[in-house]
Amino acid sequence: MDARSETALRAEREAQFIANIGAFMRRDFDAIERSMRPDVVMELPGSSWLSGTYGGFAEVGRCVVALRRVLESDHTRISFLHEGDQMIVRHDIKVHGPNHEVEMTLRVRARFDEQGKTESITIEPDDLGLFDHVLNAVLRDSEAS
């Protein structure tokens, strides 16, 4: 791939990520789904009620909807690193719980197929222990309600 087309590919991937943030905040999960392969796999490490491996649109979609309950994001403070068929995004977010609002950086590692669709996603919070704590507090609060 020549340098110009590599630059264009990187710009497309970055633009799609930014567009997906907007879709995430608007709860337009169909728009996010269109950027993924039907057999997409998403991994979220940790010990929270959301951690695990999700496969396919339906499972990944349920995880994205659940993340929307606790994450706040905008288009600022994002950096991109490209390595072959993957893009690593460092993204500042807020995680909300019943008694918490914490800022942290989320690393999103996305791998792409030849058509430019996302085939795998790994979400890595900078402070996994705090991330899990806030998510589990949300679960406890919803169970108590």
Task: Please tell me what each predicted stretch does.
Residues 53-54, 99-102, 129-137:
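A short, polar/proline- and glycine-enriched secondary-structure boundary/capping micro-motif
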Residues 1-34, 38, 138-145:
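Short, low-complexity N-terminal intrinsically disordered segments enriched in polar/charged residues
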Residues 120-145:
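Low-complexity, intrinsically disordered terminal/linker segments enriched in charged
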Residues 69-70, 95-103:
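Short, cysteine-centered beta-strand-loop-beta hairpins and adjacent loop/turn segments enriched
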Residues 55, 107, 123-124:
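Residue-level structural signal for beta-strand termini and adjacent loop
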Residues 20, 32-36, 40, 60, ...:
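Hydrophobic pocket/interface hotspot
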Residues 75-81, 93-94, 105-112:
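Hydrophobic/aromatic beta-strand elements that line small-molecule binding cavities or substrate pockets
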Residues 30-84:
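A solvent-exposed, acidic/Ser-Thr-rich amphipathic alpha-helical stretch
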